[in-house]
Amino acid sequence: MSAPFPGTLIDRSFRERIVLVGVVFPGTSAEEVEASLDELALLVDSAGADVVGRVVQRRDHPDPATYVGRGKAAELADLSRAVDADTVVFDEELTPAQQRNLEKLLGRTAIDRTAVILDIFAQNARSPEGKAQVEMALMRYRLPRLRGRG
């Protein structure tokens, strides 16, 4: 199935294999994170991909470089290879630097919940105005993430 919108983030020519990642921070329960990952799994399915793994980590705060820390990122890389995942989706917003660092460490695409939601909107935009609005939102999302990609 080909993408109906040229700016989508998940490749719909096949069903991408996705690993989900959630982090339990102080003040948040493991049950809340699991419920959020369940919702994210539904979003990923709506975007046309299959969840093949999920990882939850407890942390006091996000790692500024990799969000989950280098050790967990290495575990994610191993898991992603083992389950032949195409993409790793984080339940929380990644900074552009975190996304770049994770993609280097994981050896595959790393995106966040916002990217999945934008992708669903891109897939379902039909009117010219809707397509233009989605394209603008995608450009705003991607702009800070373009450094070093050209």
Label the predicted regions:
Residues 1-119:
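N-terminal accessory targeting/assembly segments
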